[in-house]
């Protein structure tokens, strides 16, 4: 399998909020972040921007995935955006999805359309 880096799949840019404790973010900003997909943390990107970026990545892989298996290794927010894309929902669904570490989510291509076939698989991980 060919490996390549695609910047479209990088983590959500939280800007000045990166690694900042939630308690240091104002209540007003947090409420806006959770309710307004166009809101951007200072110096970061919005959920709308993330969804557009990931949707472009998904569309680019659609034809390739019809011919062979494709694997994308990425972060929580792009995974949520890819699921939103596959389901045809809005970016707000991300608040209703929980993505674990090292999990597997599968999106198949059937008749040229995305189909979510599994979400948040962890069966491949060793039990503690």
Question: Predicted segment positions?
Answer:
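Generic structural signal for well-ordered alpha-helical scaffold segments
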Residues: 51, 55-63, 83
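Phosphate-coordination/substrate-recognition cap region in phosphate-metabolizing enzymes
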Residues: 1-30
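Conserved anionic group-binding/transfer micro-motifs
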Residues: 50-51, 72
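Acidic, low-complexity terminal tails and accessory targeting/binding regions
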Residues: 12-23, 63-68, 84-128
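Short glycine/proline- and acidic residue-enriched helix-loop micro-motifs
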Residues: 29-49
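Short, active-site-adjacent cap segments at secondary-structure transitions
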Residues: 11-12, 78-80
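Alpha-helix N-cap/helix-start capping motif
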Residues: 76-77, 101
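Generic beta-sheet signal
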Residues: 68-74
